[in-house]
UniProtKB/Swiss-Prot annotation:
Annotated keywords: ATP-binding, Chaperone, Nucleotide-binding
Role played: Chaperone involved in the maturation of iron-sulfur cluster-containing proteins. Has a low intrinsic ATPase activity which is markedly stimulated by HscB.
UniProt source species: Burkholderia ambifaria (strain ATCC BAA-244 / DSM 16087 / CCUG 44356 / LMG 19182 / AMMD) (Burkholderia cepacia (strain AMMD))
GO molecular function: ATP binding; ATP hydrolysis activity; ATP-dependent protein folding chaperone; unfolded protein binding
PANTHER family documented for this protein: HEAT SHOCK PROTEIN 70KDA
UniProt xrefs under InterPro entries: ATPase_NBD, Heat_shock_70_CS, HscA_NBD, HSP70_C_sf, HSP70_peptide-bd_sf, Hsp_70_fam, ISC_FeS_clus_asmbl_HscA
Name by which UniProt lists this protein: Chaperone protein HscA homolog
One of the GO BP terms on file: iron-sulfur cluster assembly
PROSITE patterns cross-referenced by the UniProt entry: HSP70_1, HSP70_2, HSP70_3
Length: 622
């Protein structure tokens, strides 16, 4: 009789008792999902074994779409409907979107946040991001075998309130419960700190496809304290691509405005390949033919590239110096520099970091995966899956100051930048006029002194103030930032007790009604999505069956007579043909036919294996 096993007290819960939570790195160029499995964080690949999901969504007629690799492959042939680098547009108006001039999209300057016209209608960056997040959610649930209780989603440390709220709304649209929005450098520090039991001061240099962050962290016995954060939410690997794109066109004497959208996307894709090639070679070549027949052939040396992008490299060092000053440390005080983001693979970046900090950066974890791995560890903790002795404390900070408008359009800072979160701060204000019975509270974010130079987050009114002489009323305004970096503001008149409050949802044009409509639209297209998903799953299973059968025939084909071999070959050929179509039921039927048709062959192979294993052995040896 088999003995049942009972785990030791304090051991990890059984799989069916674990609450499934994941970490998601929603990136500009690529996105990933990771989970803790058997106490080890690991990135979850797709059915083809690919860890990275290109952050690309292609919209088709009648509600269809392609996401990830399939969409990326069609970007050059259908650029207007294939959205790439959407993270750069999150929470941003058209005027704020850098690189928009080279983008082949038809932008619509909606209130607060830019939108994009596609063949399937106008799409907001939130909707596009939701498609990517939903794909990662499905991948995780398929791999882990159950529904998720939630996810930790990483955001650039320098994302402002509007961008953070947009990310949270995208997750909501994707059907994800957000356990925490975690700053990307902090996630990387978790992965490194727990893996290496590191202590001391560390800098996390995070250069992704569309954003740059630099955080200074102090790691001490399970405490991750962010001392300072700086960055640029509109600087990333895409900018290096656009600079090289402009150089190639200038060398050829071509005006970018004269290019067709298809040529813009094609050339940007080829330029990115060229940039990546220069990371491992002294020079690389570009050979591309445009839609009008013009052929561009150029060879770029690494030295030329390094000289070209030097201004961008220096742009990353400016917030680096600022963060060090804010943390009151010098480069010599830094024990290690962690590189995060695919763009940090460029030698010009690694050389600049090594020169500035006086030491080679840490690169023993994949810069593309380290953020997702750290997020997975944090998600596992928040889901309650880690033991009591396996806790750690995150002390993150807000990247930009939060303030209120005062008379004259001035900003009074309530919570200064680099304040540890969660946090609550209060300040008292008074009335400006005699008999004033209401006060307008205007919440802003930024480091400038004038409201016009800062980002407006929210407005609300406190009414019912007792009429008094100017300066007699006392209004206490409290700012409260939660662990996700999201803000609530409360105002209370001290004499009468009248109150007003607002949970800040930045005015980027996405109200609850908009989200409800998007959810309704997603329900309408759910059937299309499920059909596409079923088709893809059937095609993958068919390909697996074909490859397994061919391998078996190559190894043991002699076990079949000519008639049997002909029948199996016919079934394989039929399945291969049907799998190229779009009828999932037909593919499943053909796959089952091949499985049934090779049952006898499989049995003979099993007999052969058993005979070979037993050959030459005595009965008492078995």
């Amino acid at each position: 009789m088999a003995l049942l096993q009972i785990s030791e007290p304090g051991m990890a819960p059984a799989p069916h008792q674990r609450r499934l939570a994941v970490g998601i790195d929603l990136g500009t160029t690529n996105s990933l999902v990771a989970a803790v499995r058997n106490s080890v964080p690991e990135v979850l690949p797709d059915e083809a074994g690919r860890a990275l999901l290109p952050s690309v969504v292609r919209y088709l007629e009648k509600g269809g779409r392609r996401i990830g690799h399939e969409a990326k492959e069609q970007a050059a042939t259908d650029p207007r409907n294939t959205i790439v680098s959407v993270k750069r547009f999150m929470g941003r108006g058209k005027a704020e979107v850098e690189g928009a001039a080279n983008a082949p999209y038809e932008f619509i300057d909606a209130p607060g946040m830019v939108q994009i016209r596609t063949i399937d209608g106008v799409k907001s960056p939130v909707e596009v991001s939701a498609e990517i997040l939903a794909t990662l959610r499905y991948r995780a649930e398929d791999t882990l075998g159950d529904e998720l209780v939630g996810a930790v989603i990483t955001v650039p440390a320098y994302f402002d309130e509007a961008q953070r709220q947009a990310t949270k709304d995208a997750a909501r649209l994707a059907g994800l419960n957000v356990l925490r929005l975690l700053n990307e450098p902090t996630a990387a520090a978790i992965a490194y700190g727990l893996d290496n039991a590191a202590e001391g001061l560390y800098a996390v240099y995070d250069l992704g496809g569309g954003t740059f962050d630099l955080s200074i962290l102090k790691l001490t016995k399970g405490v991750f304290e962010v001392l300072a954060a700086g960055g640029d939410s509109a600087l990333g690997g895409d900018d290096f691509d656009h600079l090289l794109f402009g150089h190639v066109l200038a060398q050829a004497g071509i005006d970018a405005k004269a290019l067709a959208p298809e040529d813009v996307r094609l050339l940007l894709d080829r330029v990115r390949v060229l940039k990546e090639a220069l990371s491992s070679a002294p020079q690389a070549s570009l050979d591309v033919t445009l839609s009008n027949g013009t052929r561009l052939v150029q060879t770029i040396s690494h030295d030329t590239f390094a000289s070209l992008v030097e201004p961008l490299v220096q742009r990353t060092l400016t917030p680096t110096r600022k963060a060090l000053r804010d943390a009151q440390v010098t480069p010599a005080d830094i024990k290690g520099v962690v590189l995060v983001g695919g763009a940090t693979r460029m030698p010009v970046i690694r050389d600049a970091v090594a020169k500035y900090f006086g030491q080679p950066p840490l690169v023993n974890l994949d810069p593309d995966q380290v953020v997702a791995l750290g997020a997975a560890i944090q998600a596992d903790l928040l889901a309650g899956n880690r033991g009591g002795g396996d806790d750690w404390l995150l002390l993150d900070v807000i990247p930009l100051s939060l303030g209120v408008e005062t008379m004259g359009g001035l900003v009074e800072k309530i919570i200064p930048r680099n304040s540890t979160i969660p946090i609550a701060r209060a300040q008292e204000f008074t009335t400006f006029k005699d008999g004033q019975t209401a006060m307008a509270i205007h919440v802003v974010q930024g480091e400038r002194e004038l409201v016009a130079d800062c980002r407006s987050l929210a407005r609300f009114e406190l009414r019912g103030i007792p009429p008094m002489t100017a300066g007699a009323a006392r209004i206490r305004v409290t700012y409260q930032v939660d662990a996700d970096g999201l803000l609530s503001v409360f105002a209370r008149e001290q004499h009468s007790g009248v109150e007003a409050s607002v949970v800040v949802k930045p005015s980027y044009g996405l109200a609850d009604d908009d989200i409800a409509k998007m959810l309704e639209d997603s329900f309408k297209t759910a059937e299309i999505d499920m059909r596409a998903r079923a088709l893809r799953e059937a095609q993958v299973e068919a390909q697996r069956m074909i490859e397994a059968t061919q391998a078996a025939l190559a190894a043991d084909g002699e076990l079949l007579d000519d008639a049997e071999r002909t029948q199996v070959d016919a079934l394989v050929a039929a399945l291969r043909t049907i799998a190229q179509g779009d009828d999932a039921d037909a593919i499943e039927t053909a796959t089952k036919a091949l499985a049934d048709g090779t049952d006898e062959f499989a049995a003979r192979r099993m007999d052969k294996s058993i005979k070979r294993a037993l050959s030459g052995r005595r009965l008492d040896e078995i």
